[in-house]
From Swiss-Prot:
Bilayer topology: Single-pass type I membrane protein
Topology, Cytoplasmic side: 1344-1431
Stated role: Phosphatidylserine receptor that enhances the engulfment of apoptotic cells. Hyaluronan receptor that binds to and mediates endocytosis of hyaluronic acid (HA). Also acts, in different species, as a primary systemic scavenger receptor for heparin (Hep), chondroitin sulfate (CS), dermatan sulfate (DS), nonglycosaminoglycan (GAG), acetylated low-density lipoprotein (AcLDL), pro-collagen propeptides and advanced glycation end products (AGE).
Domain Link span(s) in chain numbering: 1063-1156
InterPro entries for the chain: C-type_lectin-like/link_sf, CTDL_fold, EGF-like_Ca-bd_dom, EGF-like_dom, EGF_dom, FAS1_dom_sf, FAS1_domain, Growth_fac_rcpt_cys_sf
Protein name: Stabilin-2
Keyword Disulfide bond: yes
A molecular function (GO) term: low-density lipoprotein particle receptor activity
Biological classification of the source: Eukaryota, Metazoa, Chordata, Craniata, Vertebrata
Residue span, Laminin EGF-like domain: 207-272, 822-887
Segment forming the signal sequence: none
Length: 1431
């Protein structure tokens, strides 16, 4: 690193005096505190000369400050001609830079030594001390502004471009928390804003404050005043009698120091001006003091020159005197050259031009202006800013010469300047985790990136990401990592009380907690879920429940917050994207820690019933067992499970009749439904996960929800709208986790849902038979592999491989008998008596719910009889045309005869015609006993009969939710709004069952909220009003956890969230519905890392109740859409796949159905091949990953150390540009006491091509690296099982893919063919020694590989400094080999055969050997110094 300022100056002895003054005035710290600086340092000689000339004793501090520019590191190339910069002395003291004859100057001092770098700045050497130039008198005004009101402990920031003062004001602020507004006394910062008004000192003018004209230090020669100031022109306004550019002379005809005396010469030349005395030199022919007397007599008798006058002195003596403008003795006169001496009194920047004898005119030279006596350089900057950009400074550099330099924060040539985008340098001062957005107003806006929060200057990520950044909380983070507590990586919000790192050293119980597996509970006890509690929130909160389940108390003493009355909050409000961190001074200890017995691999040993009995849930456990549900819950197709257990106390508190119902064996089916509602399948949910989802589907089929507590229940969890409270958390058993609750869950639709579980098989991805790819997400391996074709390498296509057969379990929504439609409404007549037991309900999972009535019945609920039928059984009864039947369900079947007719059916005339007096009503019948009886549906005395008002009697037989109306004797019933039916039986209309999701978005759930009413709610990971739903930004990159389950040597990319059903999802063009051609559809799926779904894949989704009324493309140009229930609006009541068939015109416009069974995209890194979930390196790396091949590996590495051919062989295994096939003997076929020659080893590699197992044809030969050939043969056993051999060695495992070839495992090593006899090698002793070391190293390698790899699945692991046994093999001339061997070995695939090591570690005696090599200086962290090898 570069030295500091003082250190660098110490290395420059010629500049030591200036360094001494910096120390004397203590300026180094002030200079070094700036982000950057530039110092102009005069050498020792220059300082000594300056002090001597000024007769001073030392340099003043102001002079040193005048040599320093802060905030910029100005290299020589940055010092532009005409540029100005403020100095450390103040903004009014500027340095100017000029380039003259290729020499760079600062002010008037040449820069002779440049670009001496320091850690933060640069030094330039000078040959002259800079004299302070004070030509600016800028005004520095300040105004006081107030910041925002906030907590006094965390002062609110001042507004932009202001600085805080020490003084603060008391203020009041409020916080709305948990439904209540709290008021606090806070502090408001006083901030100062500095406003600089540029101004020139008196006597200076223009933008750069140049000096006004004048002689010496006198402005306008002291004879006038200057038009000065920033906007001044520098023109002198002369006083009375004065004239000239600098008021340096008198007006014509005036003389004297005040130019107030007038000349009186009439015919002569006056001695005028400030230095004149007013005397007259007379012209030819005139004489006298005023030259007003004409000479008429020549007293000199013609002896005078023609340009002379003959004058008489007082004595009367005549003499000749040259006239004005001439000089001589009078007899000889010559014209005076006024320009002859001192340029005629003109300026040195003027030309003196003779006019008449003795006279001249002064004309300023080109580039200058003035009266000739005073000539000033023309400043082009004063007119039109010298042609410079308005954001540039124009600096005069010579007569009528100027340069343009863009102002700070601007760039360009000065003629055109544009704002510098500050965001391009150091991200504009924004956080590295922020976007810097540049505005045209020379401002930048810092905005934190997604997944970060803050003001843009400081941006923080998740709590899990922020904890390790702070040393005081890093130990808490490492404990979270070590004990797999990953909740804080989730979306939150959380409140974390992070103990100081040092507090872990002061807690003696940590060791016991760790050994008993309790540490994760202790760590969770420091986290409150569901709420982000800032310091002000804590001050008004008394307790909060932690993720561990126990509460912590919160108290305030002397304005300090304490947790559990013991841990002090040291720092607070470290806000992150998913919550807030408060640092506390000690570790918190929960009171109730649950010990969970586990085996050596960390698996929970106790089953559900044991754990339930241990924690007070025996009654619910017994119900599960008695109902036969235990085997269902523990079935592998459902595990892992999350169970909500009502306590024994909660079940005992149920009403007796409900307890009788639960424990009655006759109600086992209903009991199962209750119990299933307490189980979530295929999920082992953490407490923090439960509130994140809007709902959780239960094993019973209905949904339940978990919500966070409100009010005083901070951190508490409740089920189903706070019906049940969580009282125990994280009760682990062998196949899941349980949560204790304080009540039995009751669902409004309970009894109506009878979901079924459908399983079907899907093929997994095709890959190597050794490392067969995992099953897709949400599916499980069935334990069966199928042959398939795949493309493992970029240089090879269509290789036979294997794929897992994977089982997908679908929970199929289904209604119980007597219920129908998606929400399982009861059939007409009720679930217990559907269709009143007089018909069959079209129930289960259909939207119909219609009753198919038995013969004789009709009506919505089969509640009516056919015409002519009566009674509960609607039996037929026939009255003649002369009678009226009392029919219907409640009718008696009796026939009421007309007058004159009788008998049961009114088909017999009466013997005597009845006569009634008075006459009967027209609505009555005169009976045989001469009595009037009102007809059916009428009432009265027979004489007067009125129609019965049936609507007043039991609503006329109509349903309660129907309107009864009557016209005459006819009653009509009509269901009210929101209901449907015949009026006698009405059922609720479910708008969600219209076939088009109730008008909700396809990514929304339609929920019936009442008869004919519904609500649209966007699904998880979508936002909107339900009618329109857009994907929300995922709260967390799924690649951040365990690399998204990708291989360590793969790159993980989080895919855009899609609402999939068994991998199928629907895509629509941004342009709207049905805007995709077949080709565009394929592109749209590809952008989502998906493929176009096949017909079978869409069928699987339909089985999983995927219903979407929108047709889309399928593979092969087919178009279809799925329906799961009959609807006239969607598919014309077709249930299944509505198939439009394969389209001949692929340019038709449809939507598309895509297929993707993964959430992340895994891609093997450069130099690796695979599907991303499994990645293979080069042949050597793959060889190193197999513990069963370590003996051959040892031979290869020893060969590489022994000869150049060995190094070449190793290079073949690591060079990705060279491909080959490697046959490797397993350890059992190559015991440690046997060895291979170099030729033998080369005989195992074919470097001509890559030969897969199916490429090995019976009777063919393969050429090896040695140049020899290998014979391929086949054989079959009695069961016709084929075995392939290479030179008689059976191939045991094959097609193990590497990035540069393929590997086959064989039973025994191959032996190279013999060669001609060779001379014995010399150096036998040395060879033996090397052999001993190599053999022992090989044994060590085998042991190490077994020990290392038996504990974990394969994957390239970095060698540990303390544990690596390989580094002794790494000394090689090939950088590629060293690089390869220093890489981590590949992780062994879980489905690889078990490893049987040839020897065990326990029987080894170890010793230490010195390393032969290392992994290079760039791999020091992986390098070892010693290696242990067995004797």
């Amino acid at each position: 690193s570069l030295p500091s300022l003082l250190t660098r100056l110490e290395q420059m002895p010629d500049y030591s005096i200036f360094r001494g003054y910096i120390i004397h005035y203590n300026l180094a710290s002030a200079i070094e505190s700036a982000d950057a600086y530039t110092v102009f340092v005069p050498n020792n000689e220059a300082i000594e000369n300056y002090i001597r000339e000024k007769k001073a004793t030392s340099l003043k501090e102001d002079i040193l400050r005048y040599h320093v520019v802060l905030g910029e590191k100005l290299l020589k190339n940055d010092l532009h001609n005409g540029m100005h910069r403020e100095t450390m002395l103040g903004f009014s003291y500027l340095l100017a830079f000029f380039l003259r004859n290729d020499q760079l100057y600062v002010n008037e001092a040449p820069i002779n030594y440049t670009n001496v770098a320091t850690d933060k700045g640069v030094i330039h050497g000078l040959e002259k001390v800079l004299e302070i130039q004070k030509n600016r008198c800028d005004n520095n005004d300040t105004i006081i502004v107030r910041g925002e009101c906030g907590k006094c402990s965390q002062q609110a920031p001042c507004p932009l471009e202001t600085k805080p003062l020490r003084e603060t004001r008391k203020c009041i602020y409020s916080i709305y928390f948990m439904g209540k507004r709290s008021v606090f006394i806070g502090c408001q910062p006083q901030c100062v804003r500095t406003i600089i008004t540029r101004a020139c000192c008196a006597g200076f003018f223009g933008p750069q404050c140049q000096a006004c004209p004048g002689r010496g230090q006198n402005v306008c020669s002291g004879n006038g005043f200057c038009l000065d100031g920033v906007n001044g022109t520098g023109t002198c306004q002369c006083g009375l009698g004065f004239n000239g550019t600098a008021c340096e002379t008198c007006t014509e005809g005036k003389y004297g120091i005040h130019c107030d005396q007038a000349c009186s010469c009439v015919h002569g030349r006056c001695s005028q001006g400030p230095l004149g005395d007013g005397s007259c030199d007379c012209d030819v022919g005139w004489r006298g003091v005023k030259c007003d007397m004409e000479i008429t007599t020549d007293n000199c008798n013609g002896t005078c020159h023609t340009s002379a006058n003959c004058l008489l002195d007082p004595d009367g003596k005549a003499s000749c005197k040259c006239a004005a403008g001439f000089r001589g003795n009078g007899t000889v006169c010559t014209a005076i050259n006024a320009c002859e001496t001192s340029n005629g009194g003109c300026s040195t920047k003027a030309d003196c031009k003779r006019t008449t004898p003795g006279n001249r005119v002064c004309v300023c030279k080109a580039g200058y202006t003035g009266d000739g006596i005073v000539c000033l350089e023309i400043n082009p900057c004063l007119e039109n800013h010298g042609g410079c950009d308005r954001n540039a400074e124009c600096t005069q550099t010579g007569p009528n010469q100027a340069v343009c330099n863009c102002l700070p924060k601007y760039t360009g040539d000065g003629k055109v300047c544009s704002l510098i985008n500050v965001c391009l340098t150091n991200n504009g001062g924004c956080s590295p985790f922020a976007f810097c957005n540049y505005t045209e107003q020379d401002q930048r806006i810092c905005t934190c990136k997604p997944d970060y929060t803050g003001d843009g200057i400081v941006c923080r990520g998740s709590i899990y990401g922020e904890l390790p950044k702070n040393p005081s909380t890093s130990q808490y983070f490492f404990q979270l990592q070590e004990h797999a507590v990953r909740e804080l990586a989730g979306p939150g919000p959380f409140t974390v009380f992070a103990p100081l790192s040092s507090s872990f050293n002061h807690e003696p119980r940590i060791k016991d907690w760790d050994q008993q597996g309790l540490m994760s509970q202790v760590l969770r006890y420091h986290v409150v879920g569901c709420q982000q509690l800032l310091l002000d929130n804590l001050k008004v909160t008394t307790s909060a429940t932690t993720l561990q389940g126990e509460p912590v108390s919160i108290s305030v003493s002397q304005d300090t917050v304490f947790i559990n009355n013991e841990a002090k909050v040291l720092s607070s409000d470290i806000i992150s994207t998913n919550g807030v961190i408060h640092v506390i001074d000690k570790l918190l200890s929960p009171k109730n820690l649950l010990i969970t017995p586990k085996d050596a691999l960390g698996r929970v040993l106790q089953n559900l019933t044991t754990v339930a009995a241990n924690h007070g849930y025996t009654k619910f456990s017994k119900l599960i067992q008695d109902s036969g549900l235990l085997s269902v819950i523990t079935d592998s197709i459902h595990t892992p499970v999350t169970v909500f257990w009502p306590t024994d106390k909660a079940l005992e508190a149920l009403p007796p009749e409900q307890q009788d119902f639960l424990f009655n064996q006759d109600n086992k089916d209903k009991l199962k439904s209750y119990l299933k509602f307490h189980v979530i399948r295929d999920s082992k949910a953490l407490a923090s996960d439960l509130p994140r989802s809007a709902s959780w589907k239960t094993l019973q089929g209905s949904e339940l929800s978990v919500r966070c507590g409100t009010g005083s229940d901070i951190g508490e969890l409740f089920l189903n709208e706070q019906m049940c409270r969580f009282i125990h958390r994280g009760l682990l058993f062998d196949v899941g986790v349980a949560y204790g609750i304080d009540c039995l869950l009751m669902n409004p639709t309970l009894g109506g849902r009878c979901d079924t579980f459908t399983t079907f098989d899907i093929p997994g991805e095709c890959g190597s038979c050794i490392f067969t790819p995992k099953c897709p997400l949400k599916s499980k391996p069935k334990g069966v592999k199928k042959k398939c074709i795949y493309n493992p390498l970029p240089f090879r296509r269509n290789v036979e491989g294997c794929q897992n057969l994977c089982t997908v379990v679908i929970q199929t929504p289904r209604c119980c008998h007597g219920y129908f439609m998606p929400d399982c409404q009861a059939c007409p007549g009720g679930p217990d008596t559907p269709c009143n037991n007089r018909g069959m309900c079209r129930d289960l999972y259909t939207p119909m719910g219609q009753c198919l009535c038995h013969t004789g019945f009709n009506g919505t609920a089969c509640e009516l009889c056919w015409h002519g039928r009566f009674g509960p059984d609607c039996q037929p009864r026939s009255c003649s045309e002369h009678g009226q039947c009392d029919e219907g369900i409640t009718g008696s079947g009796e026939c009421l005869c007309e007058t004159g007719w009788t008998a049961a059916s009114c088909d017999t005339p009466t013997a005597v015609f009845a006569v009634c007096t008075p006459a009967c009503s027209v609505h009555a019948t005169c009976t045989e006993n001469n009595t009037c009886v009102c007809n059916l549906n009428y009432e009265g005395d027979g004489i007067t009969c009125t129609v019965v008002d049936f609507c007043k009697q039991n609503n006329g037989g109509c349903a309660k939710v129907a309107k009864c109306s009557q016209k005459g004797t006819q009653v009509s019933c009509s269901c009210k709004k929101g209901y449907k039916g015949d009026g006698y039986s009405c059922i609720e209309i479910d708008p969600c069952a219209d076939g088009v999701n109730g008008g909700c978005h396809e990514h929304a759930t339609c929920r019936m909220t009442g008869p004919g009413k519904h609500k649209c709610e966007c699904k998880s990971h979508y936002v909107g009003d339900g009618v329109d739903c857009e994907p929300e930004q995922l709260p967390l990159d799924r690649c951040l956890q365990d690399n998204g389950q990708c291989h360590p040597d793969a790159s993980c990319a989080d895919l855009y969230f899609q609402d999939t059903t068994v991998g199928v999802f629907h895509l629509r063009s941004p342009l709207g519905q049905y805007k995709l051609t077949f080709d565009k559809a394929k592109e749209a799926c590809a952008k989502e890392a998906a493929t176009i779904a096949t017909y079978n894949q869409l069928s699987y989704a339909q089985k999983a109740k995927y219903h979407l009324c929108s047709a889309g493309w399928l593979e092969s140009g087919r178009v279809a859409y799925p329906t799961t229930y009959a609807s006239q609006k969607c598919g014309a009541n077709v249930v299944g796949i509505v198939d439009y068939g394969s389209r001949a015109n692929k340019s038709e416009m449809w939507d598309v159905f895509c297929y993707r069974m993964k959430d992340v995209n895994c891609t093997c890194k450069a130099g690796y091949v695979g599907d991303g979930f499994s990645c293979s390196g080069n042949l050597l790396q793959v060889l190193m990953s197999f513990p069963s091949l370590t003996n051959f590996l040892t031979e290869v590495l020893a060969f590489s150390k022994s000869s150049a051919r060995g190094q070449a062989f190793l290079k073949h295994l690591t060079d990705l540009s060279i491909r080959g096939t490697l046959f490797v003997p397993q350890n059992s076929g190559l015991p440690g006491n046997k060895s291979l020659s170099g030729r033998d080893i080369e005989h195992h590699l074919t470097n001509v091509n890559v030969s897969f197992y199916n490429d090995l044809v019976n009777g063919t030969f393969l050429r090896t690296m040695l140049g020899s050939q290998l014979l391929i043969t086949f054989s079959q056993d009695q069961l016709h099982q084929e075995t392939r051999f290479v030179d008689g060695r059976s191939i045991l495992q094959w097609d193990i893919i590497a990035a540069n070839g393929i590997l086959h495992i064989i039973s025994e090593p191959l032996r190279a063919p013999p060669t001609a006899a060779t001379a014995a090698h010399s150096g036998l002793g040395t060879g033996i020694f090397c052999a001993v070391v190599l053999v022992t190293g090989a044994i060590a390698l085998a042991a190490y590989s077994y020990f290392r790899l038996k504990q974990r699945t394969t994957g390239f692991q970095r060698f540990d400094q303390k544990r690596t046994l390989m580094s002794w093999l790494l000394a090689s001339s090939s950088p590629r080999i060293s690089q390869t061997l220093c890489m981590r070995p590949q992780r062994r695939h879980p489905q690889s055969p078990p490893v049987t090591p040839s020897q065990t570690l326990e029987n080894r005696i170890w010793r230490t050997a010195t390393l032969w090599g290392h992994c290079g200086p760039d791999m020091r962290s992986q390098q070892a110094t010693t290696v242990t090898v067995p004797r």
